[in-house]
């Protein structure tokens, strides 16, 4: 299969639409020998800020000397943009190769009586396969929609991140903040730490789920924070309370919400650093500056 053939196949899957659920992706990754279990992952959901937090974390991990993959959606120009390693999009050749292997698994799944996987499910499986083949140290995985029934939720990550929760996709996720928060909180796994900037009733849903799962919870405004020092259209300077003391952090994105996103990424990196000594305060700050 060449790249053009791969693209024709991927685009042909668009007609199957969006169908939330775990049965298809579970069957697909099983046929691919569970590539998602061969990589360490960070799972990110939330109404806004997923992309920013994913970018910050990816740069931090790369700056820490880790081979770091990132899976995001949607793309701007090419599907290749959805899966990258250390900031480099998957090549056309590798894209075609993982498409061919994943298509073979889809064909087997269908022959065995399975339901046709959606485009997003197939691309998600492709990303897991590519990252496993490349033996990445970490993969930052962004949820497509919601969380609980999203195809990315087959992973058991090192860390779960829920940026925030507001009304979105009410036709699929629910018509209240609480209902949508339940979908977002669906990524929380047993004993896996959670970092969030959610507040109000959404936070309470996340807090209850975290307690039920015995998952340590870190909340913006309670367990960590950020204080703006100076800002312009080009960059912002704020104070962040590391364990060793407050440090000045510069980001190159405007808007108060970006400071919150940056703080979430910083806390996420600190949590990961508890198990990975290569992720130091110096490397974290370097990664933030490179974002």
Task: List each model region and its residues.
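N-terminal leader/targeting and accessory segments in enzymes
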Residues: 1-48, 52-67, 76-78, 104, ...
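Short glycine/threonine-rich catalytic loop with a Thr-x-Gly-x-Asp
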Residues: 68, 233, 253-266, 291
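Buried hydrophobic packing segments
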Residues: 57, 61, 127-131, 262-272
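Acidic, Mg2+-coordinating active-site environments of NTP-dependent enzymes
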Residues: 110-111, 115, 135-142, 157-248, ...
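Histidine-centered active-site/metal-ligand motif
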Residues: 43, 75, 169-170, 257
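A generic structural signal for residues located within well-ordered alpha-helices
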Residues: 20, 52, 120-123, 183, ...
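ATP-dependent carboxylate-amine ligase catalytic core
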Residues: 22, 26-30, 34-37, 63-155, ...
